[in-house]
A protein has these predicted regions:
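Catalytic cores of alpha/beta
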Residues: 170-185
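A conserved active-site cap/scaffold subdomain adjacent to cofactor or substrate pockets
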Residues: 152-158, 162, 169
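Conserved radical SAM core fold
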Residues: 60-70, 103-108, 119-138, 164-169, ...
Length: 270
């Protein structure tokens, strides 16, 4: 089970003070060291999920791409503050870190992370033609796929984050082609440890309006009369696909994964 850092208020009495500390942690080397040293075995034990095995996993890459954050502080004598944090956590036997990235510029991580098996990298993948509309100026999907082999060979655990899943008329062919490409390009070592995290498109109403104004092509893709977004039950100002559409396409995705990458498991899908 993965936990966001902000899910650990019991370590500190004031959850907001804790969140503020975490924000400072990823921007201040000395405070990050003090923070992770404060996480003793007793703190970690209360969050253990036996289904997850021996480790408690801290997610440090939900709101931003930390590989890019790392580049800001990287210089000739210092590999960057995110790598520094990863190496600190590796000293805690019960803890590991995880983050998602769209970047393929990961050589610094390969060279300087001391214990890569204690770091799970989630490579974000989507359809290439959708990337060219929704994620301009990010790494090509084929390059991200090829990066998986390199990271696994270096000792990292690498999962695939399929996100955002945008439902279109060509869904079955498009994702069949993507998963077939994965099967073709991944080496056996990468396949043996592969797992998926799958997230269907979800939008806040404010962000939806912003995209409509400043990214009309992306908005046009998301506004699909056949698969409309609608307010999510019990979630104020959140838009998603209807429960019926999502149920149908989750089943289709499961079938495609079993067909093209039967060795991979699905960690979660929503």
């Amino acid at each position: 089970m993965r936990h966001d850092l902000a899910d650990f208020p019991k370590i500190y009495d004031d959850v907001y003070r804790f969140v503020d500390l975490v924000k400072e942690t990823i921007s201040n080397k000395e405070k990050s060291r003090a923070f992770f040293k404060s996480l003793n075995k007793k703190d970690l034990e209360q969050y253990r999920d036996k289904k997850h095995g021996p480790y408690i996993t801290f997610d440090i890459g939900c709101d931003s791409d930390v590989t890019l954050d790392n580049q800001i502080t990287e210089h000739s004598n210092y590999p960057g503050h995110i790598i520094d944090i990863i190496n600190q956590v590796a000293e805690i036997p019960e803890a590991m870190l995880s983050f998602a990235t769209k970047s393929t510029e990961l050589d610094t991580f390969v060279r300087h992370v001391k214990n890569p098996k204690m770091c799970r990298i989630r490579l974000s993948l989507m359809l290439e033609w959708q990337r060219q509309i929704l994620e301009l100026n990010t790494a090509k999907i084929i390059d991200r796929i090829e990066a998986i082999n390199k990271l696994v060979n270096a000792g990292f655990e690498v999962h695939i984050n399929l996100s955002p899943i945008v439902i279109t008329k060509s869904f079955v062919k498009d994702y069949g082609d993507l998963l077939s490409l994965l099967n073709e390009k991944l080496n056996e070592k990468a396949k043996a440890q592969l797992a998926y995290e799958i997230i269907f498109l979800t939008h806040s109403e404010k962000l939806f309006d912003f995209v409509q104004q400043f990214a009309p092509k992306a908005h046009q893709m998301m506004v699909n009369n056949q698969f409309p977004l609608e307010p999510k039950p019990n979630k104020e100002n959140v838009l998603s696909y209807s429960p019926e559409d999502k149920k149908t396409y989750k089943q289709i995705m499961e079938t495609l994964i079993k067909k093209h990458t039967p060795y991979a498991r699905i960690r979660y899908m929503f």
